Amino acid sequence: VIINEPYEGMPAAEAGLKKGDMILSIDGESMVGKTTAYVSDHLRGEPGTTMVLKIQRPSTGKKMTVKVQRKAIQMPYLPYYGMQKDGIGYINYNQYLENSAKDVRRAFIDLKKQGMKGLVLDLRNNGGGSVQEALQILNMFIPKGRHLLSMKGKVKNANSNYNTTVEPLDTVMPIVVLVNEATASASEITSGTLQDYDRAVIMGTRTYGKGLVQIPNVSLPYNGKLKLTTAKYYIPSGRCIQALRYKHTDNGYVAENVPDSLTHEFRTAAGRIVRDGGGIKPDIEVKPDSLPNIAFYLSRVDTTDIMLNYEIDYIAAHPTVASPKDFELSDADYEQFKQRVVKSGFTYDQVSEKILKELESLARFEGYYDDAKPEFEALRQKLKHNIAKDLDYPYNKQKIKELIAADLMAAYYFEKGSLENSLRNDKQFAEAARLLGNPTEYQKLLQPKKEK
């Protein structure tokens, strides 16, 4: 088992373990040939206890003994924030855990001290968490006394209302909130409320649509657990963000998306039209770049270790590298990676080949295959695997270079370095920064469209 990514401030990193270190034994028991699950189980233990790991470091080939003290693992909910070009501040917030809003507040204050002119708040892939943390973040940007959230259930004691309770930090700083289909729950309360008050431009793709209040882990007999839904969320405009409805049928309840014909129209504070029943629709839709198939399969450590081994060798050959803001894998380094992939005999599933097989099957069924057989054969030859050619295709090459760079930055500078480096090629962030640099366009988006 090989260590992939030690996390900053966690036991592995504090003990000096690095990406690529091979675990040979734990407390004297050999781990050679053991499964990842087996090794992981032996790494776990009570916080405060210690274990002794014997590892082999690829950069030197030497075997080392390392003492590691276990502790409760808490992944960072604010893995990176920092100033970008042209006075644009960036905060990556990935989970609404207890006290996380305080870190967002501190980050915002720090960025303002550095001269921030506009903020990008990144809630992509933030699945939510504590509603109280969402309310605290909204208190930072919305005037005191404003309505933020209602919870409405079938019984009165499930109902509640929340308003801003303190003076805000800032009510004028231009803000763009980045969202995607994995932005859910408390993240949608934050982004939706900022949208309802015209306090920020929401950018990206439509959010998940989780508008239910739930009590998790209600204990049941025989070690059973129940997640109980008690109410729905309603944000200031009056809309509910829940995307699924549960329809009663003869076979029980069936979950289905709320059809557009049954959604309702609401208005923001400035009079812009917004709708319920499907998460938060961004003010500007910006789709991310798609990941090519070849890049997807090369990056999966469960199918191939080519990329991982290349990165381990790269780290061994480069004790230091450029900062995350400046680092880019060179074409010469990529060529070495390409040659390694070609020599390995690596193959992957091409979507075009799969579609061609489906088309052939359909043509046979409809009786047209024999007439078109020469064309099918010619197309099959054209689409035949050519790994070297696939790796040289400019878009594939760029995306693979970006993946390797992000992994390397995590090894040299931890997760924050990887996130900072990824902003170099982040289409959604680039559009957010561009918009914040254009005050007229930004303000126009927050005004209702003139009716014809």
Locations of regions flagged by a protein language model:
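Cleft-lining beta-strand/loop regions that shape enzyme active-site pockets
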Residues: 2-19, 24-222, 232, 421
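Polar, glycine-rich mid-to-C-terminal structural blocks
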Residues: 186, 198-199, 203-205, 209-272, ...
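Intrinsically disordered, low-complexity regions enriched in small/polar residues
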Residues: 9, 79, 92, 98, ...
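Conserved functional hotspot residues or short segments at active or partner-binding sites
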Residues: 240-452
